[in-house]
């Protein structure tokens, strides 16, 4: 019975997925999608964890807090990019080609992650 109720709730959430009006509702719907997927694959540990996350979102989520957290992530990633740029500059000073290539790769990864974060409209 629990399974049928959870499935019905999940399917309802999936059908209403395009109607999210707030960030918290969007987050809740994403968790419900994950629950549906976990139920499909009979992953009870994942279902339990997602149900706990869903309870937390329903109890504590606020759009302003999500925006603030997102801005913190962006600031942290900008610091990461700056650190990677510094590491690359130091590697170039030393002239070690292997380290330069490694630092360039890490810088590119950090910059890509920053772009993804900035593209998310919170």
UniProtKB/Swiss-Prot annotation:
InterPro entries registered for this protein in UniProt: DUF1090
Chain segments carrying region Disordered: 65-100
Keyword entries, A-Z: Signal
Pfam family name, one: DUF1090
Signal peptide stretch: 1-20
Highest taxon of source: Bacteria
Biased composition annotated in UniProt, kind: Basic and acidic residues: 66-100
Name of the protein described by the UniProt record: Protein YqjC
Protein's organism: Escherichia coli (strain K12)
Gene: yqjC
């Amino acid at each position: 019975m629990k399974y049928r109720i959870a499935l019905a709730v999940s399917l309802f959430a999936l059908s209403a997925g395009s109607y999210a009006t707030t960030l918290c509702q969007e987050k809740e719907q994403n968790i419900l999608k994950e629950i549906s997927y976990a139920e499909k694959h009979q992953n009870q540990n994942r279902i339990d964890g997602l149900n706990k996350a869903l309870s937390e979102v329903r109890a504590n989520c606020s759009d302003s807090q999500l925006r603030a957290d997102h801005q913190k992530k962006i600031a942290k990633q900008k610091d990461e990019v700056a650190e990677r740029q510094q590491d690359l500059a130091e590697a170039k000073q030393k002239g070690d080609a292997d380290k330069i290539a490694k630092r360039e790769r890490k810088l590119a990864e950090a910059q890509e992650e920053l772009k993804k974060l900035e593209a998310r409209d919170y």
